[in-house]
Amino acid sequence: MRIFSYLFSVTHQTACPCALLLSPASVTSRSLARARGHDAATGASMPPSSLYSSGRLLPARPTSSTTTTAGRWARPSCSLSMNGCAPGAGDRGAVCVREARALPAASAPQDAVGQLRAAVDALGAGAPTAAPSGIIRIEVPIRQRGDAIEWLHAQSALPRCFFSARAPLPERPALAGSSSDGNGNGGLNDHWQQPVSVAGVGSAVFFRGTNPFSLADWRAIKRFLSRDCPLIRAYGAIRFDATSDASVEWEDYGSFYFIVPQVEFNELEESSVLATTIAWDDSLSWTWQNAVNELQSTLEKISPCSVKVDKSNLQTTIMSLNHVPTKASWDLAVTKALQMIKGRQRELVKVVLARCSRYITDSCIDPVELLACLKVEGQNAYQFCIQPPDAPAFVGNSPEQLFHRKYLNISSEALAGTRARGKTRADDFKIGQDLLLSGKEDMEFTIVRDSITKKLQMICDEVVVHPRKALRKLPRVQHLSAQLTARIRNEDDEFDILNTLHPSPAVCGLPTEEARQFIRDYEIFDRGMYAGPVGWFGGAESEFAVGIRSALLGKGHSTLVYAGAGIVEGTNPSFEWDELDLKASQFAKLLRYQEQHICYQKAENMGTVI
């Protein structure tokens, strides 16, 4: 239990039956010491006011299912499911049935819901399948484009997920035989349409563990996936450091958490798809009839309509703001890191330190409404939301790709160095040139790019880096960026790609283990899924972003916003503190009615190339 465990009520009770399937993370004496207020950076005790507050991230749960005005914070209904990562599941081979079925197209979502309910009722009325395990996706095309976020906003079921691919990047190097643009958008030869955004609720099967994500866990997920059913996907996230203790706010996520949604809305370029997925496995004590019954229950709760979202702001103001660490503690931690970087033994080359900021607002923040606001200025970023049953929501707007795999083709990128956008075009150009020519920023960026290149070369053939250095311009910030492509030798190398690329020097440091140990020693909060892999596994392809520019929201007036900065030789602690503010500004802007010192500009995919 770390310092931020006070954000959740210590009387936290399991009200949701789904939570009975999940084991809480252990609490060690070291983590308890952190919760009592020991600041690793200063060696001193934190003042009580920094540990406790009357503000509650999770208020007492209602005793009955009620809907509040405007549909906000209605008590969600939780679907029962099976944990596909039971011991030995990864050794059992593929499930017996992996199938996708398409029903006739519908003119509107309301008609699609009716078709799915009828199809699942027919499954329940028929004879049980003889197959002891399987997964079936049933989908209804809709002849109009719907908004996946607005569909999700109308739903009350948990768990839920959302993932939106970013706009394609130009100038990504191509490999022979590649038909992917490296952003999960596929190519011209795809025989299925790639979703622009996917929203899902319920879990046909979930995958959760408290040990680090392993090859056996990856195989347990892949049992349910198939090239022939490319849109059956497992969406979720992995902890930044699964060997560290999870604090209370992150306990329900385990060390990793993925779901194949029971009901899913796919937003396409010109149309939509509403789909439902049923999964069963007798060996996991989840029979066909269990799965049918639970899916029928979830479908009865699905709203056939969408709910409009105000995407301009959240109509809420900040009442208080506290940072962990404080500015003084941050300066001491950065100074200690610089001592190790410049020391005789050169124990560190780079370390990335992070900050967790607690915002208390005058009203509750709906995670889906926050997601919608982030998406407005996030065309060059991945938007995501993961929320297990009875847990806070992890929401983000990440510009950074960890990797994308399509068949044997891999794409990745290096992203480091940060500057604000300029108030005018001329000012913006000048700031960008300063970033390109900065020796300190070039050192940080080169460390990241060269490390990722070497990691890919260990597993892949044909590693290509182009451009080697360019500007990535986002609405509020700009970064140095490089694009990488490679080719794995077989699809089973996907786990090695994930395991090798995470954590990258962009979010951890170099050497990896030394940087990770420094973070364990000097960060006094739990990163949880922040800076970890966030994305999806599929049969034909998979894609993961790095879970940065993210926040954790529970049912209450408190929100945790995470940001990090790279520390290398030449770093100025105060400049890096300002960089944290800059990276968190997309959240701060939405939590206030206006932000005076941040300039908003339209995102551009690429700027000057070197």
Task: Report each predicted region and the residues it spans.
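N-terminal chloroplast transit peptides
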Residues: 1-71, 80
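Non-catalytic accessory segments adjacent to catalytic cores
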Residues: 43, 47-48, 54-55, 69-73, ...
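N-terminal organelle-targeting presequences
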Residues: 62-154, 175-176, 183-185, 601, ...
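Cytosolic ligand/metal-binding cores
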Residues: 90-110, 132-138, 203-209, 268-305, ...
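Glycine-rich, N-terminal phosphate-binding loop and its surrounding beta-alpha-beta segment
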Residues: 156-253
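Active-site pocket-lining segments that scaffold enzyme catalytic pockets across diverse folds
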Residues: 308-401, 445-448, 452, 459, ...
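Functionally critical, mid-to-C-terminal surface segments that flank or help form catalytic/ligand
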Residues: 471-531
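Small/polar glycine-rich anion-binding or flexible loop at a beta-alpha turn
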Residues: 530-540, 602-605
